[in-house]
Amino acid sequence: RTPAFSATGNLPAMGKPSALIVWGGWDGHEPDKVAELFRAILAEEGFEVEVSNTLDSFADKDKCKAQSLLVPIYTMSEISGPQFEGIYEAVKDHGVGLAGCHGGMCDSFRTHTEWQFMTGSQWVAHPGNDGIRYWVNIVRNNPHPITAGLPDFEVVSEQYYLHVDPGVNVLATTPFPTPGVDGPHVQNPCQMPTIYTKRFGAANVFYNALGHHADVLEAGVPRELMRRGFLWAAKGVGL
C-alpha cells in the first residue's frame, strides 16, 4: 500500500490531521532546520502543523491531546513535571502518536527515565564521532509498511550506539563494530537497532536514529522513512 518514494501518503477522508513539533535543546543537532524539514514533510501530507520552540507547548494538555502526532526535537536539556505530563498523557492515554529522530527524541532529558520508557531507547555513544561511513540494513524477515520496498543504504554521519528497550519492533539495524573505528565496544559485535516502532499505552511510537544534521534526512531513503514513520505513528492516519 505504500510504494517506495511515494510523493503522497494515504490520509483518510476526514478532517485534517494535526502535528505539533517542539524544537530546542543543543544547537549542534540543528533543531531549527530539522523542525523545518519535518514541517515540510508533514504539510505535504496534508497535516496542519504547529512549530514551537518552547517545551511549555507540551504543558498544554488540551493542545497535546488534540493532536494526531507529537514530534520532539530537543537534545539534552531538562523537562519539567507539567511539560512531561502533557506529552506523556497525550501519548499514553489519548493515543496521540509520537515520532522523532536522533538525539532530538532519544537523547533528550538524560536523567528522565520515564521519557526513555516512553521513547524506547537512550543514546550512550557514537564511536568515531561524525563522518563515519556505515550501512543501515532493513530487517527483511520483519516486513512492515514503513520499510516495504526500501533498499539498504549507506550513511556518512554519526553512528548511534543505543541502549534499547527489548520490547521495540526493530525495522532496521546497523552493524557494530565499524571497520576502522576502535573503542571498548569492539569485542561485542552486534546489530544495533537504528529504526524501530513500539506501542506505548494507546499510541504508536516511531524512532529513527539518523539525523545528526538535517541534511542526513533531506533526501532519498532517510526522508522516506521519516515520512512513512510520521504517517504510521499519527493517530487516525496510518499507512
Residue ranges of each PLM-predicted region?
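Helical hinge/lid and interdomain linker segments adjacent to catalytic or ligand-binding clefts
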Residues: 9-21, 26-107
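Conserved beta-strand segments of alpha/beta enzyme cores
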Residues: 48-50, 169, 204
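Catalytic beta-strand/loop cores that center a nucleophilic Ser/Cys/Thr
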Residues: 43, 65, 129-201
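Short, solvent-exposed loop/turn segments at secondary-structure junctions
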Residues: 26-27, 77, 105-107, 175-178, ...
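Extracellular ligand-binding/catalytic regions of CAZymes and related secreted enzymes
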Residues: 7-18, 40, 44, 179-193, ...
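Extracytoplasmic/secreted proteins, especially bacterial periplasmic and envelope-associated proteins
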Residues: 33, 37, 86, 145, ...
